[in-house]
A protein has these predicted regions:
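Extended alpha-helical targeting/anchoring segments
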Residues: 1-198
């Protein structure tokens, strides 16, 4: 996986409780100046969803947004990234944080439960690993980090696969979403089409 998106990190070593963090990506453009108002609106909507998800398991008043709408450069494109953090309630752990936040809000949309129902109704194939989470957890050290499984290849029956897509909002256009999907896929296609490794 070459995912640039953090789904959930967990750090219980701070001495200030168990800190969880999520950095959803919403908004993709070919230049740093190319973001549309819909990209910003979509990012803020998902930040609110993630704040709500974390608020279910974090101490009251601890959920914060230390970074909103940061522009990150990645090979061939730019993303809007925000970060949401919180301190888990006493007695809550890593599994509680995952239960409260999975699947990642950036790939479901909001409201999450209704959006998941629409996805189930409209998508003809299960997503599998795509849009899930990949990472590591060290229970002994009380740390972990999971990404959102975008920009991720998987092999099925001798075929190399990857998924890509875009979020549909009230002011999306089919042409704009298709262009965003192609932009996200461009480097993956280039990598998959390169010389085979022995």
């Amino acid at each position: 996986s070459a995912s640039p998106e953090r789904f959930l990190s967990f750090d219980g070593r701070s001495g200030d409780g168990d800190i969880v963090s999520s950095s959803p990506i919403k908004g993709t453009a070919s230049t740093a100046e190319g973001f549309l108002p819909k990209d910003r609106a979509e990012n803020v909507m998902i930040v609110d969803l993630v704040r709500n998800d974390l608020g279910r398991v974090c101490e009251f008043g601890s959920v914060a947004v230390p970074e909103l709408l940061a522009v990150e450069a990645h090979p061939g494109l730019f993303h809007l990234v925000s970060t949401v953090t919180g301190r888990l309630q006493p007695g809550r752990g890593w599994s509680d944080a995952i239960d409260a936040t999975f699947p990642p809000g950036s790939v479901t949309g909001a409201p999450k439960i209704a959006a998941c129902g629409v996805i189930d109704d409209l998508e003809t194939e299960p997503r599998g690993v795509y849009c899930g989470a990949i990472g590591w957890v060290d229970a002994d050290r009380r740390v972990g980090d999971l990404n959102v499984a975008i920009r991720t290849f998987w092999i099925e029956e001798d075929e190399l696969n990857f998924g890509t897509g875009g979020g549909i909002t009230w002011d999306s256009t089919p042409e704009g979403e298709w262009a965003e999907t192609e932009l996200k896929a461009r480097n993956l296609l280039r990598l998959a089409s390169g010389p085979a490794l022995a």
